[in-house]
Amino acid sequence: MQLSWKDIPTVAPANDMLDIVLNRTQRKTPTVIRPGFKITRIRAFYMRKVKFTAEGFEEKFDDILKGFPNINDVHPFHRDLMDTLYEKNHYKISLAAVSRAKTLVEQVSRDYTRLLKFGQSLFQCKQLKRAALGRMATIVKKLKDPLVYLEQVRQHLGRLPSIDPNTRTLLICGYPNVGKSSFLRCITKSDVEVQPYAFTTKSLYVGHFDYKYLRFQAIDTPGILDRPTEEMNNIEMQSIYAIAHLRSCVMYFMDLSEQCGFSVEAQVKLFHSIKPLFANKSVMVVINKTDIIRPEDLDEERAKLLQTVTELPGVEIMSASCQLEDNVMNVRNKACEKLLASRIENKLKSQARITNVLNKIHVAKPQARDDVERTPYIPEEFKKLKKYDPEDPERRLLARDIEAENGGAGVFNINLKDKYILDDDEWKNDIMPEIMDGKNVYDFLDPDIAAKLQALEEEEERLEKEGFYDSDEDESYGGFDQEEIDEIREKADWIRNKQKKMIAEARNKKSLRNKAMMPRSKLVKSFGDMEKHMATLGHDMSSLQDKHRAAAEKSRYVETGADVVFGQNDSMASGSNGGKLRQSDRLLDGVADGSMRSKADRMAKLQRRQRNRDARQGEADRHATASLPKHLFSGKRGIGKSDFR
């Protein structure tokens, strides 16, 4: 349930709303259209204008209708409060006018869009667009007064305090200037204006405080005058509606000193006149300003008037002084206790809730099977035990007694392992590891582990004596002879080597996945590799070896006499080296030494710098790029986009 309305969007005046929506249409829709364009494009241009403007008005109206609360859906307290402050009928008529304007704008947009579909020229479409926007503007201008009223309501709603009608509430009421605001300032941290004249509080003020870890709200209401409800103003009606609708403890304040300007008789009369509003509520009468006069100091006539209030059932009277802060917190605590008790009582009276809870509860009670009385059994040994007495010198010493005898806590540490029950008392203080070899030691503990180990050892000795583990020499290899075993081992070695090669080949392929790979047809393959591969497969390569040798002898070069002569001439011509001339580096042929070479490199680098800055492809690149690209620096706004201007 919504308790405050501080997030309602601002309601713009009619003229401002027109400027906002029309400027938005001008900024966010295309602006260029020419008579030479296709008629379908012209129609779409102006239809977009009309629809976009209508959507802008509809969004504004939707924000208003959704932001303001529906007066029929809120709590009765808020409904009556809004009726008092803003006049319910005026509020409904204003929102209805906005809703009607939204419907009319939608209808205008729909009608003129239908007409624009049949426009014959640019001028005709433009005039239809002007007519549509003009009618929308006329509709919005008629909302001038409702929009101004709704903006004032929005501002006032945002300043209203957040009052929860269902939480624990103390409601402070009474005549003006009897000390209601002073009491609220004393029990809460709210900064309420306090003045020595009447009608200082003109609206509801809320303060919060904690009592017994529960959150309470205290509401200070404007002063009420003793007159008919029809004659009360809006300020007084706020108090009446708060008393009528809020589930609270009503604290009726009285000023017996009559400094508030109203007599005790008038204050008692007001209490009796608003008494019907106290139905189903806890009521407390608070006598304020006891620093001036106390109830005991009243004369007999006024004491009888006050007694007519206290004699009513369920009404409790207390006194306090907000000026001296005397008994203020006691009054507050008493009111809180009274409110909590009444809330619990109301919950218990609601039969529906109790019925729902009782349907879920079943109390199971055991039924007696016979009439035999079965008393609890206590062994005789326990009955004979002597009762522990700390003053008895022969008592059994407890651990704390031993600790006290040896210096007390912090000096003497009690041995917690002293009561362990083990086979050997020397084992009590042994260190027991929790983790050993990465395993939990307690998972392998067994009380009978020694007996089980001894039984296993005896069984092993018996099996060895019986020859259970002895085996014949023929059966040592599973019935295979030595030759078969050697053959199996050779095959196993071959399989292992083959697996290693396959793994190595797979790794090589994986490493070359993103690198350049030599084609299979270009790989150099020797006859020796093929011979080894075929031998591993079990093929006889003797015939292929003979053919390979014969082919190699035929291809071998045989020197003749002419070859010898040419060879000698070549060796003489090449000098003492007798080999081929090395090819020189053409980049360094024209450079004398290292210093000249570094200077040449530096000059070449300087020449490349400007070319790189201009992004030239080389020395011959003389292309002149456009300094002002025409497609970026010419033209106007197109449909749906704009240029760089």
Curated annotation (Swiss-Prot):
Its main location: nucleus. It holds the Pfam family NOG1_N. GTP binds at residues 174-181, 220-224, 288-291. One of its GO terms (molecular function) is GTP binding. GO terms for cellular component: cytoplasm; nucleolus; preribosome, large subunit precursor. InterPro entries: G_OBG, GTP-bd, NOG1, NOG1_N, NOG1_Rossman_fold_dom, NOG_C, P-loop_NTPase. Residues 567-645 are annotated as: Disordered. Coiled coil: none annotated. It comes from the Eukaryota. Residues 612-624 have a biased composition (Basic and acidic residues). Keywords: GTP-binding, Nucleotide-binding, Nucleus, Ribosome biogenesis. GO terms for biological process: assembly of large subunit precursor of preribosome; ribosomal subunit export from nucleus; rRNA processing. Gene3D superfamilies: 1.20.120.1190, P-loop containing nucleotide triphosphate hydrolases. It is found in: Nucleus, Nucleolus. Residues 168-340 form the OBG-type G domain. Belongs to the TRAFAC class OBG-HflX-like GTPase superfamily. OBG GTPase family. NOG subfamily. Involved in the biogenesis of the 60S ribosomal subunit. This is Nucleolar GTP-binding protein 1. It comes from Candida glabrata (strain ATCC 2001 / BCRC 20586 / JCM 3761 / NBRC 0622 / NRRL Y-65 / CBS 138). The lineage of its organism: Eukaryota, Fungi, Dikarya, Ascomycota, Saccharomycotina. The gene is NOG1.
